[in-house]
C-alpha cells in the first residue's frame, strides 16, 4: 500500500529554519567586505567602506579606506538593510510562538506581512547601493576596469529572495490550519487499496 500524504505537522518547522538561514545570509551581507570588486583587484568595497588595497583593506581610515557613511545614500542603504534585518529577527522569534500552539496561528499572516516589509526594505537597500555607488564614483569612466558585485552582495539578495518566499508561505499557512495541527485526515494521491 503506497500512501503519500501531506505531513504539515512535521514540516512546519522548515519555515523558521529558512528564516534562520536568511538571518545568516543577512549577517554575511552586513559584515562582508565583498560587495564590489574591481577586475584588477585594486578596489574592494563593502556596505560600509571603499578600500584601495590589493587585499581589500581592513576597512579603516589607517589603510586609506573611505567610509561610505559620509554619503546620504550610503547611510540609507545601510539603514534600510539593517531595518530589514531587525524585522527579520523579530519575525524569526515570532514564528516559534506562532507555530507552537493553535491559538497563535492568527499571527502567521502578521509575520508574513512583516516579512514582506523586510523584503521591501532590503530590495530598496540592494538597489540604492549599486545605482548610487556607480553614479558617485563614476565607475563607467574607465572602460578598462570592470566592476563586479561580489559574494556579500549576492548573500543580501539570497536573504531577500528567502524573505519573499517565506512571506508568501506565512500568509498562506492559516488556510491549512487543520493540517498544521494534525487534525486533518491524510490526503492520498493514490486511492487506498
UniProtKB/Swiss-Prot annotation:
It is found in: Cell junction, Desmosome; Cell membrane; Cytoplasm. Disruption phenotype: Knockout mice exhibit postnatal lethality and defects in stratified epithelia. Decrease in expression of Dmkn, Krt83, Sost, Lama2 and the amelogenesis pathway proteins Ambn, Enam, Mmp20 and Klk4 in first lower molars at birth. Upper and lower first molars show defective enamel formation and architectural abnormalities suggesting impairment of enamel matrix secretion and mineralization at postnatal day 2 (P2). GO terms for cellular component: cytoplasm; desmosome; Golgi apparatus; mitochondrion; plasma membrane. It is a multi-pass membrane protein. It holds the Pfam family PMP22_Claudin. Keywords: Apoptosis, Cell adhesion, Cell junction, Cell membrane, Cytoplasm, Membrane, Transmembrane, Transmembrane helix. Induction: Up-regulated by UV irradiation, doxorubicin (DOX) and Tp53 in embryonic fibroblasts. One of its GO terms (biological process) is positive regulation of T cell apoptotic process. Expressed in the stratified squamous skin epithelium of the skin and the tongue, but not in simple epithelia (at protein level). Expressed in the oral epithelium, tongue epithelium and skin (at protein level). More abundant in areas of lower flow stress in the inner curvature compared to the outer curvature regions of the aorta (at protein level). Expressed in luminal cells and myoepithelium cells of the mammary epithelium (at protein level). The chain crosses the membrane at residues 12-32, 81-101, 110-130, 151-171. The keyword Hydrolase does not apply. Belongs to the TMEM47 family. Component of intercellular desmosome junctions. Plays a role in stratified epithelial integrity and cell-cell adhesion by promoting desmosome assembly. Thereby plays a role in barrier function of the skin against infection. Plays a role in mammary epithelial tissue homeostasis and remodeling during and after pregnancy, potentially via its involvement in desmosome cell-cell junctions. Required for tooth enamel development via facilitating desmosome-mediated ameloblast adhesion to the stratum intermedium during the transitional stage of amelogenesis. This is p53 apoptosis effector related to PMP-22. The gene is Perp.
